[in-house]
Amino acid sequence: MNKQELHDFIGFRQPNICQIVAYKDGVEVYTDEWNGYKKDDTCHIMSATKSIVSLLIGIALEQGLIKSIDDKVLDYFPEYKVKRGEKTIYAITIKHLLTMKAPYKCKGDPWTKVCSSEDWTKTSLDLLGGRKGITGEFNYQTVCLHILTGLLYQTSKLTTVDFANKYLFDPIGIPNHVNYYAETAEEHKQFTMDKSPKTNVWFCDPLNIGTAGYGLCLSASDLAKIGVLCLNKGIPVVLVNFFLEENV
């Protein structure tokens, strides 16, 4: 099968694919695009954003901004006031958030409650914990993972996009990104669901903290560079080896 035959096959059989990049021996050897996309266009990678945020946490760990993923979440939010009667939140660690084993007081993702607030990190912390305690059960979350990017800001004093640009994107040749904030709920929905090409943006809250569970826009080429980075054990970006191994 030649390139044109493959292009036609994917265009007919896989309408959701917009870009493909292939590497061999660390070198890009094949690219193609569909659905009006160009090579440098980005798309909303949705929940794959979680994996990128996990890498940023690993970088912060290597830099000593975070001491351990076993640290309690509240250690990094000393100004946060825990509500009366809440006990579980004190025991929740960064690892609980990263592995989707943190308990919450809500069922499902509280999109409206978090995204209509002025401080998404604080609102997410308000929902962390609950009466059931830490059960160790898998509990998939998207919105409330905002705590992780809030934690990055607490430790680095850099917004999510600035931290990513400086310590992840720049070193491996990914274009600098900027914040994108939706003024209305409709604009928010349009951003998350629209499949048309996007630019180099990261969705953020009113305080310019990037969303941790969704919202990052990358091209297939960008994602391939991150994949090569992981295969190269974090070089040239400095990442803790055991952290990479756990993520993989």
What are these regions (language model features)?
Residues 238-248:
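Acidic, glycine-rich loop-and-strand cores that form catalytic or ligand-binding grooves
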Residues 7-38, 69:
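A short, well-structured edge-of-sheet supersecondary motif
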Residues 48-54, 91, 141-145, 220-223:
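Short alpha-helical patches at coil-to-helix transitions and adjacent helical residues
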Residues 32, 122-130, 197-207:
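The feature captures the short pre-catalytic strand/loop hairpin that immediately precedes
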Residues 26, 44-69, 97, 148-152, ...:
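Active-site SXXK
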